[in-house]
């Protein structure tokens, strides 16, 4: 059992956005590009983006239509879940060895 068994599509999308951000946390990837890359529907991506904005993980760029910023909170969520994933996987490996 690994942490991926417990993460959902929204985290996969948020983690992808984290990987796509530049050093100013700007995400220049469009929702269509995210949908294609992750092989998810455009509707799924749009719902996730709306949820992320609502919860403070993403912020719309008011000067550029369709551009978003990953907030500090969004970055922290991804980093913490990734850290937790490593720890859970290490514990899982230890339990398999015993």
Question: Where are the model-predicted features located?
Answer:
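Minor-groove-contacting beta-hairpin "wing" of winged helix-turn-helix DNA-binding domains
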Residues: 64-72
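A short, conserved structural fragment
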Residues: 53-63
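Short alpha-helical segments that sit at the start of domains
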Residues: 1-16
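Short, locally clustered residues in the helix-turn-helix/winged-helix DNA-binding domain
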Residues: 15-22, 82
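A short alpha-helical element within helix-turn-helix/winged-helix DNA-binding domains
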Residues: 27-37
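Short, charged/polar, Gly/Pro-enriched secondary-structure boundary elements
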Residues: 74-80
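Short amphipathic alpha-helical interaction segments
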Residues: 8, 39-54
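Amphipathic alpha-helical dimerization/coiled-coil segments
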Residues: 82-98
């Amino acid at each position: 059992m690994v942490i991926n068994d417990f993460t959902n599509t929204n985290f996969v999308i948020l983690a992808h956005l984290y990987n796509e951000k530049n050093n100013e946390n700007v995400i220049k990837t469009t929702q269509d590009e995210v949908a294609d890359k992750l092989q998810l529907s455009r509707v799924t991506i749009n719902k996730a983006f709306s949820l992320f904005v609502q919860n403070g993980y993403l912020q719309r760029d008011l000067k550029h239509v369709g551009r978003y910023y990953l907030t500090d909170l969004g970055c922290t969520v991804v980093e913490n879940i990734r850290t937790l994933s490593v720890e859970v996987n290490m514990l899982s490996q230890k339990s398999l060895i015993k």
